[in-house]
């Protein structure tokens, strides 16, 4: 009789087990079908009146409505973009340009001369952090990077409010961190900023707008722009089983929340984002959003159960040889994210993964894959000790990850650790 565990491993020999869903997700079957259908039947220009063009416009309108429903907004507040990077850049540069334009209208000498000031956290994705650094470098804006708490792993509301200046025009805080999974208190922050902005208005000071990059949260936890109270929210399709395009929610587009185009050309997307629309990818994004609207609660329950099972198995097998880096007291985290370090033997996270037979995962954010063997800055800033940060591996489960997958992966990580231990001794 064949040993059950051995049979499971044999069944996995021909495929790898993917646990890097925070980096990207495979397109859902329904999304692939929608994209293929649009390529065949809706290839026309959406601005034209013939059948293929009308079909394209219909698909785009449907997708816009579906994406708005997913985040609790209105269809007219959704702008399609090439991805999260473009959406984030649009918000940041719009805030700067809007401050400069409206400063001429304000009658307050305290801010007339000042550069616009933007507040963010020190653990943001590069698509927020690097544009802000560029604005700072070119003397177009003042930037404050508020440190996250090394206890909770999140940016604290009082620290953000303390950083506000008379010339502050925007706060940009991610909704959930891609490496630790920590969920930031954006809703609480928005309430404080709204109260503060009312006082500032009476003083002739600029309103403080609020942006959140929701790339990691969508499809894992419920996201509602009304509850969050944000002006802007970034949407990234490939993080929730959609295609690699994005969208930007802008509450009260053009009047309540200013937005300025970064590109100029044909009058698409309300003149905010020119260029003929990418109908198949937009339709696919809409389909992915519809799946989230229908099933997000079930996705969250499943991923949390599998993630918790993964951490229990890791603790049972490794004991004090590992450190779970994404457990922060007093902070919520994404239901799918486990950041773990192998402490004994002391190895690099990259080395641990390279000795695994089945596991496909990463040591952190894909945008930092060029940093070599240096520890993750996000983990260090979140209070993870340097030795643990150097050996960290990010394991992020998905909608279809099973307990059988976890069982095999934990054994895979264990045999990899044993091999590394023997190599260290020899």
Curated annotation (Swiss-Prot):
It catalyses: L-selenocysteine + AH2 = hydrogenselenide + L-alanine + A + H(+). This is Selenocysteine lyase. Gene3D superfamilies: 1.10.260.50, Aspartate Aminotransferase, domain 1 (3.90.1150.10), Type I PLP-dependent aspartate aminotransferase-like (Major domain) (3.40.640.10). Its EC number is 4.4.1.16. It is found in: Cytoplasm, Cytosol. GO terms for cellular component: cytosol. The keyword Cytoplasm applies. The keyword Ribosomal protein does not apply. The active site is at residue 367. Catalyzes the decomposition of L-selenocysteine to L-alanine and elemental selenium. Belongs to the class-V pyridoxal-phosphate-dependent aminotransferase family. PANTHER family: CYSTEINE DESULFURYLASE FAMILY MEMBER, SELENOCYSTEINE LYASE. Homodimer. The modification N6-(pyridoxal phosphate)lysine is found at residue 239. It comes from the Eukaryota. It comes from Xenopus laevis (African clawed frog). Its cofactor is pyridoxal 5'-phosphate.
């Amino acid at each position: 009789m064949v040993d059950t565990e051995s049979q499971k491993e044999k069944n996995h020999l021909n495929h790898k087990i993917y646990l890097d869903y925070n980096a990207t997700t495979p397109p859902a079957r329904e999304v692939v079908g929608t994209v293929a259908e649009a390529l065949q039947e809706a290839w026309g220009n959406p601005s034209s009146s013939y059948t293929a063009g009308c079909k394209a416009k219909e698909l785009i309108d449907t997708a816009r409505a579906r994406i708005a429903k997913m985040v609790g907004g209105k269809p007219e507040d959704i702008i399609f973009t090439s991805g999260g990077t473009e959406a984030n850049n649009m918000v940041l540069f719009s805030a700067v340009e809007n401050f400069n334009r409206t400063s001429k209208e304000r009658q307050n000498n305290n801010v007339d001369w000042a550069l616009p000031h933007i507040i963010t956290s020190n653990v943001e994705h590069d698509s927020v952090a690097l544009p802000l650094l560029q604005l700072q470098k070119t003397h177009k804006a003042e930037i404050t990077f508020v440190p996250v708490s090394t206890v909770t792993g999140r940016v604290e509301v009082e620290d953000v409010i303390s950083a506000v200046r008379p010339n502050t025009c925007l706060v940009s805080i991610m909704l959930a961190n891609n490496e630790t999974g920590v969920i930031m208190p954006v809703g609480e922050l928005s309430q404080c900023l709204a109260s503060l902005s009312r006082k500032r208005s009476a003083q002739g000071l600029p309103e403080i707008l609020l942006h959140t990059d929701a790339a990691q949260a969508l499809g894992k936890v419920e996201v509602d722009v009304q509850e969050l109270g944000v002006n802007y929210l970034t949407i990234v399709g490939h993080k929730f089983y959609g295609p690699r395009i994005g969208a930007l929610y802008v509450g009260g587009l053009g009047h309540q929340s200013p937005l300025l185009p970064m590109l100029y050309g044909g009058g698409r997307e309300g003149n905010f984002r020119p260029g003929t629309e990418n109908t198949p990818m937009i339709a696919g994004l809409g389909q992915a959003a519809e799946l989230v609207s229908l099933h997000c609660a079930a996705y969250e329950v499943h991923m949390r159960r599998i993630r918790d099972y993964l951490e229990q198995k890791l603790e049972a097998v490794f004991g004090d040889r590992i450190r779970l880096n994404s457990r922060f007291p007093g902070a919520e985290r994404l239901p799918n994210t486990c950041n773990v370090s192998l402490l004994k033997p002391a190895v690099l996270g990259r080395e641990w993964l390279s000795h695994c037979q089945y596991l496909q995962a990463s040591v952190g954010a894909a945008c930092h894959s060029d940093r070599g063997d240096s520890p993750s800055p996000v983990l260090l800033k979140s209070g993870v000790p340097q030795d643990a940060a150097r050996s960290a591996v990010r394991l992020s489960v998905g909608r279809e990850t099973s307990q059988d997958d976890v069982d095999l992966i934990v054994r895979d990580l264990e045999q990899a650790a044993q091999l590394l231990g023997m190599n260290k001794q020899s």
